[in-house]
UniProtKB/Swiss-Prot annotation:
One of its GO terms (cellular component) is nucleus. Its main location: nucleus. It comes from Debaryomyces hansenii (strain ATCC 36239 / CBS 767 / BCRC 21394 / JCM 1990 / NBRC 0083 / IGC 2968). Belongs to the RTT106 family. This is Histone chaperone RTT106. The gene is RTT106. Residues 47-75, 390-482 are annotated as: Disordered. Keywords: Chaperone, Chromosome, DNA-binding, Nucleus, Transcription, Transcription regulation. It is found in: Nucleus; Chromosome.
Length: 482
């Protein structure tokens, strides 16, 4: 065999036999086949060089370009995701971070030359299956993955099967840690169930069968048994790809994920269905921005966290970085919680975050959680008490304490770079709250109200005033006569 024909030996044995049979039957065909192979070899090499050039040019972005906020050590997914590469997917999911759009959440395999296939999580367009965001090295890139109930939905029978699926990325897996927004989406498990039934992946009668099996031990506040089975399946799929998803949705079984509090403004979940809460989530404000404070206990995969979300910017910090917690602005209905935390992103600078307008009915359960994590209550700190005293000396008393507003007003929704401690220099929620001049406008208002009251009293009853003048005049005349 000549050197020109050595390429035949590189073919699979079946294909070799077919080529040899063709050449024996039609000897001139060997030249045509050889030219055909040379043509494809040359064009494939040129295509690879061109693709490599495009990938190395920073000004040229392919369709599968990963946004800067989620880039870094991750490599991009070139072009469309093919059906044979998909491990599983959740189609038409509503994402609210880092982008607001309906996308397919896809776990798929990425095969790179000379490497074994690796699982990748991509957010892809439903029509083209071209990724807008892709996360590689899932086991080391994902910091926290949780499935959460949504405040206001857990009390509604028609909405409690909708959960919030959240992925937080490690800062060292992003090119810019200050723009490292989490991936957050709403998953309607009733819709997922219909999609799986339509695809033939679960039988149509499965829901009825599971409901009958769990009827004797069913929780009235839990999600449907079929949806819980789907979540268990997803957890296994996530784990195969390197992600440990922690589920906090209330269980259909009375022996796990029990709701110890279930209101429109607050939810608490006990994973073991006992008195120990593993999730506490309540409505709160940070400045003028409304949201929810979440507190998560540690588990076998994650450390404990405090989170504020779910409008940008979304905050997350380790409970181990919390120095202490204090309570202020306490009224009959609401109170504020001030968290003092070490911000490692700013050279371990100590920062304070205030979460206000928390309903008093959740104070005990939140305070119990704080104490269970070994966090000190610093409400009677002397520095804070001195500032309150200064306020009292300015003439406002209790009114100043109640009117002092949380200082960190983070209502700049467009600021997606905010993280813990990323406020403007000079801002401090505690400093402004206890500033002796914080209520000076209130003093003026009170003074004006008092002046208005005096004026109103003077002119309130002109007839009575005239009658009083007549009595005085008559008394003087009687004295003169005497």
């Amino acid at each position: 065999m000549s050197n020109d024909q050595k390429w035949i030996k590189s073919l699979p044995s079946d294909l070799q036999n077919q080529v040899n049979a063709l050449v024996e039957a039609h000897p001139p065909s060997l030249t045509v086949i050889h030219k055909l192979c040379e043509y494809f070899k040359t064009n494939a090499s040129e295509h690879e060089d061109k693709r490599r050039k495009l990938s190395s040019d920073p000004e040229i972005k392919s369709e599968g370009h990963v946004p800067e906020a989620l880039s870094g050590p991750k490599s991009e997914v070139p072009g469309q995701i093919h059906e044979q590469e998909i491990i599983f997917e959740l189609p038409q999911i509503s994402f609210q971070s880092p982008i607001r759009k309906k996308l397919n959440l896809i776990f798929h395999l990425l095969v790179e030359p000379g490497q074994s296939p690796k699982p990748v999580m991509s957010l892809a367009l439903p029509t083209t299956y071209v990724p807008e965001i892709s996360i590689h090295n899932l086991a080391s890139s994902i910091r926290l993955c949780v499935l959460l109930p949504i405040l206001g939905n857990s009390t509604n029978n028609t909405k409690r099967n909708i959960g919030l699926l959240c992925f937080w990325i490690h800062d060292d897996a992003a090119s810019d840690p200050n723009k490292n927004d989490p991936i957050i989406c709403q998953v309607n498990f009733d819709q997922v169930k219909k999609q799986l039934i339509k695809a033939g992946k679960i039988p149509a009668e499965a829901e009825t069968q599971l409901k009958e099996m769990n009827e004797s031990n069913q929780s009235q506040d839990g999600i449907k048994a079929i949806n819980e089975a789907i979540i268990n399946f997803l957890q296994k799929q996530f784990q195969l790809c390197g992600i440990h998803m922690i589920n906090y949705l209330p269980s259909s079984s009375a022996t796990k994920n029990k709701l110890t509090i279930n209101t429109d403004a607050g939810v608490a979940v006990s994973s073991n269905a006992n008195s120990v809460n593993d999730l506490v989530m309540v409505e709160a404000y940070k400045g003028a921005r409304d949201g929810a404070v979440l507190m998560l206990t540690a588990n076998e995969y994650n450390q404990p966290y405090i989170i504020f979300g779910f409008k940008k910017p979304i905050l997350i910090f380790d409970i181990s970085k919390v120095q202490h917690v204090s309570y202020s602005n306490i009224t009959r209905l609401t109170y504020s919680m001030i968290v003092t935390v070490v911000n490692e992103k700013k050279d371990s600078k100590v920062e304070t975050l205030e979460f206000g307008m928390i309903d008093q009915k959740y104070f005990q359960i939140m305070d119990e959680f704080i104490k269970s994590q070994g966090i000190n209550d610093n409400s009677f700190d002397e520095d804070l008490r001195e500032k309150v005293t200064t306020n009292a000396n300015s003439g406002e008393g209790e009114q100043a304490s109640e009117q002092a507003a949380p200082a960190d007003s983070d209502d700049e929704e467009e600021d997606g770079t905010f993280q813990v401690g990323q406020e403007e220099e000079g801002e401090s929620s505690v400093d402004e709250e206890y500033d002796s001049n914080a209520g000076s406008d209130g003093d003026s208002d009170v003074g004006e109200e008092e002046d208005d009251t005096n004026e109103n009293n003077e002119g309130a009853n002109p007839a009575a005033s005239t009658e009083a003048d007549d009595v005085v005049t008559q008394s003087k005349e009687e004295d003169d006569e005497q």
